[in-house]
UniProtKB/Swiss-Prot annotation:
This is Chromosome-associated kinesin KIF4B. Residues 1000-1234 are annotated as: Globular. There is a cross-link at residue 1196 (Glycyl lysine isopeptide (Lys-Gly) (interchain with G-Cter in SUMO2)). It is found in: Nucleus matrix; Cytoplasm, Cytoskeleton. SMART domains: CXC, KISc. Residues 1086-1144 are annotated as: CRD.
């Protein structure tokens, strides 16, 4: 009897998974926020939902199980049904939470799901309840394309599985496999078997997407050991639903599309059931029969069960719509009321009911008689919890130990796989050789017998030779078998070493991981095939052995059967004879005793016949059994052959996969080698990325503006809707006037809101796509930056050095960093716009809006007005669409024309480009010809320069020869000058003598006008003789060619300026004349005391070769040894008279060290200046030769100073002598007549 309890709501747990790498790479943001310490989640900014449990992305599996699922297990042992239901979008973590992909290797991992944890907790509780007997059965089914498939059926064929409803037991599934389990390991193996058989495929949103709804059911029956009539039955349904999906996001095609349609259909029916159960306003009808999923979950939703719904959601803002839908369905599920009851056995329930009636009657009876009710009626014996806990602990330890042993044995089995196969092959070869050896041995025995019987000696010798050869063959066979076994052991050891050696390098590629998993799966299949093959071979071997043993028995039985049949025939004949004799004996009374004897004999014969027939039947049965055994053996041999073929195919496939993996590895190595070429193109790619980024920026800017406009329109539409709502409330208060206008305004606003909402959705999708593209660009740029920071090893071994690579990285790293920052800024902007639009859509699409949409139309008149307005809008929109289609066709036609024109222009441009290419080639040819011509001209100019240099050298040689001639002439002129000086000295001596004689005789005086005539054109004063013994005590000064040119130019200017410029010229001469250091003697300190004009050596100052100064007592007006305004330094004055001639003063007044022919006393003529200019041009290219010993002292000294002060590389100049006489530029000297 079922005991009803008060209805309890379905408990809902919300679980949010973290962002997956794909969503992070697309730049998705969290659209859910969790309130700490509260079971509340907020969508967007202000839309919140509250559930029984809320688990954020950081929550572990153990916490989810302990808080939400573990309390349901305690109710199972009280007789209540329980259901755990995982609901949500595809890829939201339902299978992960439920443990639908559990394997034995994940036993102690923290990521184990709910189903394995439920199994462990169930058996722990069972171990604690030692006073109960438990019977557990498990079943596993899936609903694939609206068909129920049994996951525990080994054949995986479509069995006849039907759904039936029992009034007492609820929903039952007829034809479903139920396996009895005793320990947790058996239950886990059933779960793993079902998981391996479940339909899983890959989509664009989930690489391991469940394509079916799966239900794992554990049925528990418990009985008290002390009271067999007290029993409870309960069921635990663990449901892993397939996720709802959109074809646009999953990109499903073919079978995947069909599966997705059926999944969405079943979930739609489930949503309708949840809505019907959660809405109190609707009728009592719930559409359970719309799908098989809702039919199977009929007891879990609104029936006899404690139900927990785990709503799994994705936090990415790109899945906000699906997440919001899941949250709304979960919120509706909280309103569902279940009525769980304790499931008791019907007979036990009836018995308990009768006991309750008896107790009630006893209570009434005692109350009637004034008695009391004993208080120990409902007392129950206590349980020994301590012993149960100790037993549970020991079982847990034993379970862990067995698990470790199992894992170790599995590893050893995997390593011995190849050895087993090779050993079997060698075993087969050895068996074949063993048969051959047995034949050889039999032949050998026959030969030995033949040798014994033979008498001919030659035949005996031949037979002995054959025997020796047989022995040799046997020895060689044994050696071959030993070598083969050794080779097999060596190969297996090498393979084991290779398998057990640690991996030196791990590839992060998914292909490598997939290859390893595939190899492991195939190895597992081979192990299973080997196990099955070994069992069947052992069975065949045993049956063959039994057949071989039964073979002689069969022949014996056949003989016995024949003999028995003959005996039966004989005995039948004897029996017939005895029957006839008995019939005759009955007629004869005297033969009564004989007839009794015969009658006994007849009975004995009948007994023998019956025994023989019984033996005959038994032997016939044995023969039939042998025939069936032979058929079984042949069938097993065929299966063994097929399994061996399958194993060979698996091994071949494993080798092919290994070869493919090796080829893939080689391909990857080639790609690594090609990194050098790719690195050279990165600069171009960077420029291309910059251009694309600019284009994308412009496009994204435009889309941002469009999204902002759509957002504004949506906001305006919502504002208008609020205003219309307010106006409608006001008009309702005033009356029912203007119904048509009100309905028209309301429908217009609704349509505008819907259109704005759809536009906002479209812009939202565009923004999501834009952010995805931006995120991909950021990932690519970051990968490029990392690859530039860490160049591959192959690249470091290239021709260019690592420093050059680092330089290239530094050049483009700043640009890449700036691009990444700008893209991240754009992503943040897109995320803010997405969040804003999503919030607006959440406000516009409230949960109650579909209900409130048509509440404004309450009468037929309002409905007619609405239909009339909608029909009018439809007609106008159709007309507008027709106009747009016409304009579109025209635009397409014009576009086609433009494309045609564009094609023609492109052809024209291609022709022009061809012509320009030809022109470019022609211009290139002309350029090359000009270059060749210029090269030839350059060669000719080089030849001409060489010739000019040759002619210049020849001219230089001529000038050098001319200089030598001039040097020779100067030497001759020097000799003439010396002779002239000697003559002048003699003349001076004679004049002095003459003057002395005149003074002495006082007969003749020198005429003053002769000596002091200022108007004389030229007055000659004989030079003072220069004795060769006198040592020069004055510093020599030289004059270079530049000073000589300056003096000549200055003297020419004096000719042009006239006599009035003499003072200034005199001052200029003092500037360039070097200062002479004069050694003043003691005799000349007081000056001279001449009375005349100080014109001869009688003057002390002139004798000391110095000028008269202030200390002299001579008359300054008469003294000719004075210079006005000058120091006492000897100079050579240069004056010019009215006729343009020069006057040379007494050479004795010249500073010591200067010769008589110092060029400062005369101005060179124009011919000398011309020759000097020509020589200067020549000397600018060639260094002047060493000065001759006949050069003037001043010239030598000036050249020395110039050479010390000239810059490096400047050629030294020298003074050139004229080809004419030295005095060609001077006026002739007139001698004084005595």
């Amino acid at each position: 009897m079922k005991e009803e309890v008060k209805g309890i709501p379905v408990r809902v747990a919300l679980r949010c998974r973290p962002l997956v790498p794909k969503e992070i790479s697309e730049g998705c943001q969290m659209c859910l926020s969790f309130v700490p310490g509260e079971t509340q989640v907020v969508v967007g900014t202000d839309k919140s939902f509250t559930y029984d449990f809320v688990f954020d992305p950081c929550t572990e599996q153990e916490e989810v199980f302990n808080k939400a699922v573990a309390p349901l297990i305690k109710g199972i042992f009280k007789g209540y049904n329980a259901t755990v239901l995982a609901y949500g979008q595809t890829g939201s973590g339902k299978t992960y939470s439920m443990g639908g992909a559990y394997t034995a290797e994940q036993e102690n991992e923290p990521t184990v799901g709910i189903i394995p944890r439920v199994i462990q907790l169930l058996f722990k509780e069972i171990d604690k309840k030692s006073d109960f007997e438990f019977t557990l059965k498990v079943s596993y089914l899936e609903i694939y394309n609206e068909e129920i498939l049994d996951l525990l059926c080994p054949s995986r064929e479509k069995a006849q599985i039907n759904i039936r409803e029992d009034p007492k037991e609820g929903i039952k599934i007829v034809g479903l496999t139920e396996k009895t389990v005793l320990v947790a390991l058996d239950t886990v193996s059933c779960l793993e078997q079902g998981n391996n058989s479940r339909t899983v495929a890959s989509t664009a949103m989930n690489s391991q997407s469940s394509r079916s709804h799966a239900i794992f059911t554990i049925s528990i029956e418990q009985r008290k050991k002390s009271d067999k009539n007290c029993s409870f039955r309960s069921k635990l349904h663990l449901v892993d639903l397939a996720g709802s999906e959109r074809q646009k996001k999953t990109k499903a095609e073919g079978d995947r599309l069909k599966e997705g349609i059926n999944i969405n259909r079943g979930l739609l029916c489930l949503g309708n059931v949840i809505s019907a159960l959660g809405d109190d306003k609707k009728g009592s009808f719930v559409p359970y029969r719309d799908s098989k999923l809702t039919r199977l979950l009929q007891d879990s939703l609104g029936g006899n069960s404690h139900t927990l719904m785990i709503a799994c959601v994705s936090p990415a803002d790109s899945n906000l719509e699906e997440t919001l839908s899941t949250l709304r369905y979960a919120d509706r599920a909280r309103k569902i009321k279940n009525k769980p009851i304790v499931n008791i056995d019907p007979h036990t329930a009836e018995l308990n009911h009768l006991k309750q009636q008896v107790q009630q009657l006893q209570v009434l009876l005692l109350q009637a008689h004034g008695g009391t009710l004993p208080g120990s009626i409902n007392a129950e014996p206590s349980e020994n919890l301590q012993s149960l806990m100790e037993k549970n602990q020991s079982l847990v330890e034993e379970n862990e130990k067995l698990s470790r042993c199992l894992s170790k044995a599995a590893g050893q089995t995997a390593q011995m796989l190849e050895r087993i196969i090779l050993t079997e092959q060698v075993n087969e070869k050895l068996n074949a050789k063993l048969e051959e050896l047995r034949q050889h041995v039999a032949c050998k025995l026959d030969l030995q017998k033949l040798v014994e019987t033979l008498e001919d000696q030659e035949l005996k010798e031949n037979v002995e030779i054959i025997c020796n050869l047989q022995q040799l063959i046997t020895q060689l066979s044994d050696e071959t078998v030993a070598c083969t076994a050794a080779a097999i052991d060596t190969a297996v050891e090498e393979e084991a070493q290779v398998e057990t050696s640690p991996e030196t390098s791990r590839s992060s590629d998914a292909f490598t991981t997939q290859h390893a998993l595939h190899q492991a799966q195939m190895s597992k299949e081979v192990v299973e095939l080997n196990n099955a093959l070994a069992l069947k071979e052992a069975l065949v071997r045993k049956m063959t052995q039994n057949d071989n043993q039964l073979q002689p028995i069969q022949f014996q039985y056949q003989d016995n059967i024949k003999n028995l049949e003959l005996e039966v025939i004989n005995l039948q004949k004897e029996k017939e004879e005895l029957v006839r004799e008995l019939q005759t004996a009955k007629k004869n009374v005297n033969q009564a005793k004989l007839s009794e004897h015969r009658h006994k004999l007849l009975q004995e014969l009948e007994g023998q016949i019956a025994d023989l027939k019984k033996k005959l039947n038994e032997q016939s049965k044995l023969l039939k059994l042998k025939e069936s055994t032979e058929r079984t053996v042949s069938k097993l041999n065929q299966e063994i052959w097929m399994m061996k073929n399958q194993r060979v195919q698996l091994m071949r496939q494993m080798k092919e996969d290994a070869e493919k993996f090796r080829q893939w590895k080689q391909k990857k190595d080639k790609e690594v080698i090609q990194l050098k070429e790719r690195d050279r193109k990165r600069q171009y790619e960077l420029l291309k990325l910059e251009r694309n980024f600019q284009k994308q920026s412009s496009v994204l800017r435009r889309k941002t503006e469009e999204a902002a406009a759509a957002n504004k329109r949506l906001k305006d539409a919502l504002q208008k809707q609020r205003e219309v709502t307010d106006k409608r409330k006001e008009t309702q208060s005033h009356g029912k006037e203007g119904i048509a206008a009100r309905v028209r305004n309301w429908l217009g606003n609704e349509i505008e809101v819907m259109v704005s909402t759809e536009e906002a959705k479209r812009h939202l999708n565009d923004l999501l796509e834009d952010r995805k593209i931006l995120a991909q660009d950021v990932v690519q740029l970051k990968e490029k930056k990392e690859s530039r920071e860490n160049p591959p090893p192959k690249l470091r071994k290239c021709t260019f050095s690592l420093s050059e690579v680092h330089g290239q990285v530094l050049e483009s790293e700043d640009c890449i960093t700036k691009q990444i920052e700008s893209l991240e800024t754009e992503m943040e902007l897109r995320s803010a716009q997405i969040a804003d639009l999503q919030q607006k859509l959440l406000d516009a699409e409230s949960e109650d809006r579909p209900k409130q949409c048509w509440e404004n139309i309450a009468t037929i008149l309002e409905a007619k007005c609405a239909l009339k307005y909608l029909i009018g809008e439809l007609v106008s929109s159709k007309i507008h669409v027709t106009k747009l289609e016409n304009s579109l066709r025209q635009s397409k036609a014009s576009c086609a024309d433009m494309q045609k024109m564009l094609f023609e222009e492109q052809n024209h441009f291609s022709e022009i480009e061809t012509e320009l290419q030809a022109e470019l080639v022609r211009m290139e040819q002309q350029h090359q010809e000009k270059v060749l011509y210029l090269v030839s001209q350059l060669q000719e100019s080089q030849m001409a320069e060489k010739q000019l240099e040759k002619s210049a050298s020849e001219k230089e040689q001529q000038l050098v020869s001319t200089l030598q001639c001039q040097d020779e002439e100067l030497e001759k002129m020097r000799e003439v000058c010396e002779q002239n000086q000697q003559l002048l000295q003699e003349n001076e001596i004679i004049k002095q003598k003459l003057i002395l004689l005149q003074v002495a005789s006082r007969q003749k005086h020198l005429p003053n006008d002769t000596l002091l005539s200022p108007d004389s054109s030229f007055e000659y004063i004989p030079p003072k003789p220069k004795p060769s013994r006198v040592k020069e005590k004055f510093l020599e000064q030289s004059m270079d060619i530049e000073d000589l040119k300056y003096c000549s130019e200055h003297s020419v200017n004096e000719h042009e300026d006239g006599d009035g410029d003499g003072d200034s010229d005199e001052g200029d001469d003092e500037e360039w004349k070097p200062t002479k250091l004069v050694k003043v003697s003691r005799k000349n300190i007081q000056g001279c005391s001449c009375k005349g004009w100080c014109g001869n050596k009688q003057c002390g100052c002139r004798k000391q070769k110095s000028d008269c100064g202030v200390d002299c007592s001579c008359d300054p007006t008469k003294c000719r040894n004075r210079q006005q305004g000058k120091d006492s330094l000897g100079t050579v004055e240069q004056t010019q008279d009215s006729e343009g001639s020069f006057k040379l003063e007494d050479p004795t007044e010249v500073t010591p060290g200067l010769s008589f022919f110092n060029p400062v006393c005369a101005t060179p003529n124009s011919k000398i200046l011309k020759e000097m200019c020509d020589m200067e041009q020549v000397l600018s290219k060639k260094t002047a030769p060493a000065p001759s010993p006949f050069d003037l002292p001043e010239s030598k000294h000036g050249a020395t100073e110039y050479q010390q002060n000239k810059p490096p590389g400047k050629k030294k100049k020298r003074a050139l002598a004229s080809n004419t006489s030295f005095f060609s530029g001077c006026s002739p000297i007139e001698e004084e007549a005595h």
